[in-house]
């Protein structure tokens, strides 16, 4: 009888262990940079790993894209580009990313993910809009433009936010759903880099958006330049909502 009880104990223990290891989804966190390397990258990695612990999803860090293959990506539901810059994937790896999204999975771009892969038209459409220029870091007012998307509660009532405010080029694809904008009357968008000038984007200056693309899902937020942002619960709630939607399609 004692032996039977011991067997049952181990069976239930193993079943409990298997159950405990079942996570909501698995995210691949890509941090490759071939251009500017953000000081905040380290803090972003820690923050997203902590989001995984708190919200019960797995996070795997990929700093070198050499392992970016169809086989490797099979186990993931979402790929996150955290402050990536420059041309980080070769042509074969680009096709892998395309097939990943076409299989019904998701992408999340954070801040300088829009300063990545300018010559890859498919990726430009995946992100939706590409970075052009930015003024100095300033405090400005953020406005919610779609309160039906989750994770935006902390931005209510024209919240003041300090960040690097990207000015974007034209839409690369129609159907972008804007969820946050920045009020240009609350900061100075003017900037000049040599012959390149920034004058702002007017009343509709997007900061975050999402859309369905090529069979999968894409979420992008321009917030996330400064290290301190990655310990702000308002930003982390916003970021997790985007990750969750991109991975699952649920709001």
Task: Please state what every model-predicted region is.
Residues 24-116:
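Helical hinge/lid and interdomain linker segments adjacent to catalytic or ligand-binding clefts
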Residues 87-157:
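A glycine-rich, often tryptophan-bearing local segment used as a flexible ligand/cofactor-contacting loop or short
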Residues 22-25, 31, 53-57, 187-188, ...:
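Extracellular ligand-binding/catalytic regions of CAZymes and related secreted enzymes
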């Amino acid at each position: 009888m004692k032996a039977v009880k011991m067997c049952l104990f181990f069976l239930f223990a193993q079943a409990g262990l298997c159950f405990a290891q079942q996570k909501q989804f698995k995210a691949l966190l890509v941090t490759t940079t071939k251009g500017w390397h953000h000081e905040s990258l380290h803090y972003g990695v820690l923050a997203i790993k902590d989001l995984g612990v708190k919200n019960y999803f797995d996070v795997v860090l990929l700093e070198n894209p050499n392992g970016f293959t169809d086989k490797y990506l099979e186990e993931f539901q979402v790929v996150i580009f955290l402050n990536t810059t420059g041309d980080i994937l070769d042509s074969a790896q680009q096709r892998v990313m395309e097939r990943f999204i076409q299989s019904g999975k998701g992408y999340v771009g954070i801040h300088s993910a829009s300063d990545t892969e300018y010559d890859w038209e498919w990726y430009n459409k995946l992100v939706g809009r590409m970075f052009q220029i930015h003024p100095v870091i300033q405090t400005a007012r953020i406005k919610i433009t779609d309160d039906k998307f989750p994770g935006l509660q902390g931005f209510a009532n024209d919240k003041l936010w300090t960040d690097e405010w990207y000015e974007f080029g034209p839409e690369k694809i129609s159907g972008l759903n804007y969820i946050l904008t920045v009020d240009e009357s609350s900061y100075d968008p003017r900037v000049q880099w040599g012959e390149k000038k920034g004058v702002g984007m007017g009343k509709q200056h997007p900061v975050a958006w999402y859309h369905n693309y090529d069979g999968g899902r894409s979420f992008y937020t321009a917030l996330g330049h400064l290290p301190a942002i990655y310990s702000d619960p308002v930003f982390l709630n916003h970021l997790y909502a985007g990750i969750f939607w991109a991975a699952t399609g649920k709001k």
